[in-house]
Amino acid sequence: MKIIRFTTQQGKEVMGCDWDGKTASLVEQSEDYTFSDTGERVEVVKVLPPVEPSAIICIGLNYRRHAKETGQEIPKYPAIFMKYPGSLAGHGDAVVIPKCASDPPEVDYEAELGVVIKKAAKNVSEEEALDYVLGYTCTNDVSARRWQKHAGAFQWTRGKSYDTFCPCGPVMTLTDEIPDPQNLAIKLRLNGETMQDSHTSDMVFSIANMISYLSQSSTLLPGTLILTGTPEGVGFTRKPRLYLKPGDRMEVEIENIGVLENLVEQEE
């Protein structure tokens, strides 16, 4: 099942399934995070991020070919950083380039598979880790490269946490439709041209490994969103470098999830 969060004509925030681009069927959610289709179809007025995350945890340099294109060594352990929950944006929302990241241009795209945690996870083994996953979604780890590097090492939070810098959606595909998250095609198109075209099998650390590793230090709370790294093809490694500008259209497409689309705007 693919779950969508949205607002109705009455302004209510609800969850649905079987979204056809205009309407969706309302779903009921139980305490154990199972969903049932009510069969009642309503108009989708505004698509919302499919999750309201308690935390957004990100993993850097997690695709082998991406590490190679940046000239960096593959990490021995997952490289962890955070994005502020306030950076979340939905399908169709504008990604706004802040004034401080406009001159010179520096804002980049990063297609990523997002993982939504279902239940509290602490000291979870790799073998049981996927039992703690509710579903998967498309995300875009938008990054202001100059600000990302100010603190050095992997202290990237500020450059990746500006408002709207974490587009997410349009739906969350539940685990019953994605039994193997390491077997998904992932792409990003910029103004219709494919910039990233890869596969989750190129990940250095698997989804199960990441969840197990993260749960050893802190309890992963329900609703935690994990961004699992971006593949090769980002803008700053290109010659000449390619950065986002107002009017650009980004599309993140992940197999069996859908297409997350966002336009780029400039902060006034």
What are the language-model segments listed below?
Residues 121-125, 177-180:
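Short helix-loop capping/hinge motifs at secondary-structure junctions, enriched
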Residues 37-50, 66, 98, 145-268:
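Catalytic-pocket segment enriched in acidic/His residues
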Residues 91-116:
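A structural-propensity feature for long, helix-poor, extended segments
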Residues 7, 58-62, 82-83, 108-118, ...:
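Short beta-strand segments
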Residues 1-79, 251:
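N-terminal non-catalytic cap/leader segment that marks the start of a structured domain
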Residues 122-136:
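N-terminal accessory regions of nucleic-acid-interacting proteins
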Residues 74-91, 107-109, 245-256:
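Structural signature of FAD isoalloxazine-binding scaffolds in flavoprotein oxidoreductases
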